[in-house]
Each structure stands twice: as C-alpha cells, then as structure tokens.
Amino acid sequence: MKGRMKLRLVLDTHTHTIASGHAFSTIIENAREAFRKGLQLICITDHGPEMPGGPHIYYFGNLKVIPEKIEGVEILKGVEANIMDEEGRIDLPERILKKLDIVIASLHDECFEPSEDVERNTKALINAIKNPYVDIIGHPGNPIYPIDIERVLEAAKEYGKFIEINNSSFVTSRRGSEKICPIIAGKAKEMGVRVAVGSDAHICFDVGRFDEAIRLLEDINMPEELVLNTSVDKVKQYLQEKRKRIGGGQNSWN
C-alpha cells in the first residue's frame, strides 16, 4: 500500500497587511514570520479598493517600491480583488493588474450580495476565471455563495487557473466552508484541476499556517503536480506562463 503523501509548501499565496484595513501586521512582519517558518516566498494580496477600509488604487501602483526580498524571503506583489458582479468584473483596472504577480479573485459580501442563486454565483466565478489577469479563485467553498462546483472547476482547467484551498476557511473564517472545501478538493483531484494553498493571514502569526489545508490535501492524496506551492521552480514557471498569457515582459514594473 502506498504511503500517505507529505506536502511541504514554499510559498504562501494569500497574505494581508495593515493596508487591508482589518489586518494587523506589516509586510516586514509577515516576511519575518515567513522566514521563521521556512517559506521561500510570500505574496502580498491586500484587498482590492472596493473593500471597505481597503487600500487606495495608488497603493497597488506603488508596490514597485517593495524590495524583491525582505528578511531573505522573496516578495510577490498581488491583490485579493473583489468580484463585483456576475459578469466577473473585479475592482482594479488593467493598467494595475498587468503589473501584479498574483491576482486572487474572491466573492465578499461587502461587494457581492450573498445569494442562494447558484447560477448567479457560478457565473460570477466563471467570468472572473476568464479574465486573463486572474490567477486564483479565492475561498470558493464559502457556503453563503453556493456554486456549481463542477462547472467552476471545468472553467479553471480550461483557462489554466488555480482553485484556492484556503486554510482560514477551516479555522477562523466563513463558517461551514470546512464541509464544502473537501468536496471541491476531491473534485479538483478527480478532474486534474490545479490548486493553490493560502493562509489568508490577517496577522503575521498566521503567515505560513497551512495545517488544515495540508491535512485535507494529504488525506485525499492530492498529486503534488497539481499544487502550485510545492516548489520555487513551479511558481516561477507559472509566473512565466502568465507573462506570456498577458503579453508582459520579465519585469512588469518597467
């Protein structure tokens, strides 16, 4: 009998700083904690500007001043954008999106009214997936937005996007997600859809906290090749893939 798979992650794809308005740590504090936990990269993904208390659009334009490495940890520059409507529109313009390394698109009740309308919610996620700048669909297991899981995963596979396995959905956020996330993860494995694991840290101590997400992926023996965060090479390869997809160069900030 094959042994249980062990996952080790090198990147936290989903972290917030004080710029999000309801998070409590700085980029430096997050990087320090990432180094302490043995991560090689983190992505700063503060909320998009339509989130109450979120950063102004200028914040995202000025991410260029952040060094490539802090405390020995490589810093990727991103956003957790808000999906605003069922057309999948997100709250940053193309001129900003094309500069970012990682764009997570998520449904939040402050920006998209919760509804039992599965078709509406599904359409919003699929249309966000079709956006060439979007990389990851954030916390899709939120029970206040029921979706057609298979259709969303089919779209993610078709467009080469990732479905997030969000650790905070098992711990502090979005009650009820812990029942839906295993269904999504299992179906992703079955369909060969890539996933990205994020802590969704809103305080530095949670950066690199993946215990529940990893437990789920190990329990279902998710193939390592379907998990973005397992090697630096895989992350870099995807970022090159993305630059080709959106027509960007090696250094998108120039």
From Swiss-Prot:
CDD domains: PHP_HisPPase_Ycdx_like
Lineage, opening ranks: Bacteria, Bacillati, Bacillota, Clostridia, Thermoanaerobacterales
Required cofactor(s): Zn(2+)
Binding positions (Zn(2+) 3): 80, 108, 139
Gene3D superfamilies in the cross-refs: Metal-dependent hydrolases
Keyword Chloroplast: no
Family (UniProt): Belongs to the PHP family.
GO-annotated molecular function: phosphatase activity; zinc ion binding
Protein name, entry field: Probable phosphatase TTE1963
Annotated residues for binding of Zn(2+) 2: 22, 47, 202
HAMAP family from the UniProt entry: YcdX_phosphat
Lyase listed as a keyword: no
SUPFAM superfamilies (UniProt xref): PHP domain-like
GO cellular component assignments: cytosol
Cofactor note: Binds 3 Zn(2+) ions per subunit.
Superkingdom in the source lineage: Bacteria
